[in-house]
Each structure stands twice: as structure tokens, then as C-alpha cells.
Amino acid sequence: MQDKNVKIQGNLVRVHLSGSFLKFQAIYKVKKLYLQLLILSVIAFFWGLLGVVFVQFSGLYDIGIASISQGLARLADYLIRSNKVSVDADTIYNVIFWLSQILINIPLFVLGWYKISKKFTLLTLYFVVVSNVFGFAFSYIPGVENFFLFANLTELTKANGGLEQAINNQGVQLIFWEQTAEKQISLMFYALIWGFLQAVFYSVILIIDASSGGLDFLAFWYSEKKHKDIGGILFIVNTLSFLIGYTIGTYLTGSLLAQGFQEDRQKPFGVAFFLSPNLVFTIFMNIILGIFTSYFFPKYQFVKVEVYGKHMEQMRNYLLSSNQSFAVTMFEVEGGYSRQKNQVLVTNCLFTKTAELLEAVRRVDPDALFSITFIKKLDGYIYERKAPDKVVPPVKDPVKAQEN
């Protein structure tokens, strides 16, 4: 049986080469609202569940504004327990850690509504509410606080005893470097896995044209305005917010707890409380998140696209008559073997637009050669066509339209 991708022409063999340009390429084609909400619901489910496992009871901090919520939750938990207030400390902790994020996001929803887009804001609002409700519900699963993938950090802490045990007994998951390395290694794997999974989840959320809320609104707005890669911006924003949350929830709270405990090596408000494994591995987690987000969602990676074919005039007319925002250059080339004339269409565009451009090319010329070259550096200006007030419907069959 002859391979349909191979065609013999005389003493030449024509082979069809193909490959996916984008990670999660199928997600880019999801435009129906109910499918987008379904995908966000699935991600929100795992975001909440894994957030409880990897963050809430491990001593790591979540990304973005959630770090501040978690820090406030741990401080409130300490104040309630130390002052013996007659309220359920676990419930207060869970409410502040999960549900308070919805309230904190309200001003940022307003920013997104007016500065980014209404659909972006509504999809983000949906994800923030659903993921935090899931996380709040999962935090009440019996025994979830003792569920660990690699090592039971609670039992290890009890075995070590001393100041670390006293602090952890009050709900502050703090690890010191002087103790057994088993906890540090476990925490490192937690950071590695959760950082990678967050990058996968977050990239899919961005492709759908939403975000995880919080300070991501500011990062996304700045990224859109300045055309900067969002992975690096997310790392900066997440690190700053984490340092605030960590200072409140671990450094301050742990030091206050240690004031009533006689310990020579770890002084309250000392360097051991600040430069703990919790701090180092959460920063490591944010680095993993930033690197893989840029890899999975290269929003501002520019490429040079060259299209070789016989219907480039129809291709040009199609791009100009549709809502595609591609600036094109055309020239004629001659084949070195056949001496046949062919046209080449060249454009510089964002890598995330290549799948869309390829689909447009295939509508006009299924046999065209589509080539992509990554651009390392650019120096100059780019022009982006604004969406018209009234959308012009694209030509459904550009080849027949050209012939007519």
C-alpha cells in the first residue's frame, strides 16, 4: 500500500512533512463558550484539589495573591489559637486561605473589565470562584492534612521535636535547614511537580483567554501593553507577592511563636526563620512556573513564516479581506531543478498565530510549503491592525472567489 504522504514524480519523491506548531494546539480552536467553561471547570477541580495537597499542608505558598491570603490565614490561625478564642480555627483558616481570594480579586476584576476585556474578566471570575470553592471543599476531607505523596512532613516534624515541632503544632508549616534532609527533599519535589502542573494549567487558561486571577491581571495587562513575555513577568509578580505572604504567614508568625521557646540556634526574627527551605523552594517553584509557562505559551515569541505555492495572490486577497492581522511581503522565485516559477509569501508574526495562518494557507493551497524560522531578536516597530467595529466575514472559498 502506498503512503498517501509520499508521491513519486519521475525520479523525484515528494514527501509530506508535518508537525504541530503549538503546545495544546487543539485548545486554540476552542471558541464556543460552553466548551471553554467546561475546560475551566476541569482545571479548577484539579487546581483546588492539588492546591490542598501540594500547598496548604506542605509549607509551600501558592502563586500570586493567594500567597498573601495564605499568609494572613496562618497569622489568623496563630492569633486564634494563642489567645484561645472560642471559634473554630480551622474554619477561619480555610475561609481566609480560599474564599477571601474572591473578595480580594474584586478590584482587579474591575481593572480587567475596563483595561483588558469583558470576556477575559468574566472567564477569569468564573475560574477564580470555582477553583477556590473546590479548594475550600477539599480542605475538609477527613485526614487530608496527613496525606503526603513522598513523606509525612507532620510525622517527621514530631520525630524531630524541639522548636520546629512546637511551631508546626500551632499550624505553621516551617522547616529548618538543620533538621533531617528527608523533609527538604520532599518539599523540593513538591515544588518541582506543582510548579510544572501550574504551568500546564495556567497555559491552558491563557490560551482560552482567561487567567487565574489576582495579580495576574496586572501581569497580563502589562504584558499586553508592553509586548513582554508573560512568563518572566509572572515570576516577578509572583515572587513579590509571595515574599509578602511568607513574611506574614511564616517569618512573622513563626518568630512570634518562638519567643516563648528557649532555643539557641534559631532566634526569633533571625535568618533561620526567613531563609528557610519553605522560602527557597517556593521561589524555585515560581522559577519552574515561569520557565514552563513561556515554553507552553510563547505569547510574544516572533517567527518568520515563508509560504511557497502557486496561489499566493489568492492568499494575499484572503488575508486582506478577512479579519486576519498579518502584514505580508511577496516575491517570485525560480526552482533550481525544475526552473518553474513560484511565489513566496513572507510575514513576521507571533508564534501563537502560526496555526491560524497555516489553516488560512491550507484553505487556499493545500500543497503549499509552510516554513517557520524563529526570530531571536527584533529591533524596530511592529504594526497591529485593530479589530474593526463591524466584523467583516471572511471569504469562505478564496480560490473560487478569485476565479469568479
UniProtKB/Swiss-Prot annotation:
Transmembrane intervals: 37-57, 92-112, 122-142, 188-208, 230-250, 272-292
Per UniProt, what is the membrane topology?
A: Multi-pass membrane protein
Please give the GO cellular component terms listed in this UniProt entry. plasma membrane
Paired cysteines (S-S): none
Q: Where in the cell is it found?
A: Cell membrane
Source taxon at top rank: Bacteria
Q: Which Pfam families match?
A: DUF2179, YitT_membrane
Q: Which keywords fit this entry according to its UniProt record? A: Cell membrane, Membrane, Transmembrane, Transmembrane helix
- Which InterPro entries does this chain map to? DUF2179, N-reg_PII/ATP_PRibTrfase_C, UPF0750_membrane, YitT
This protein's major location comes to: membrane
Q: Which PANTHER family match?
A: UPF0750 MEMBRANE PROTEIN YITT, UPF0750 MEMBRANE PROTEIN YITT-RELATED
What is the protein's name according to its record? Uncharacterized protein MG432 homolog
Q: What is the protein's species of origin?
A: Mycoplasma pneumoniae (strain ATCC 29342 / M129 / Subtype 1)
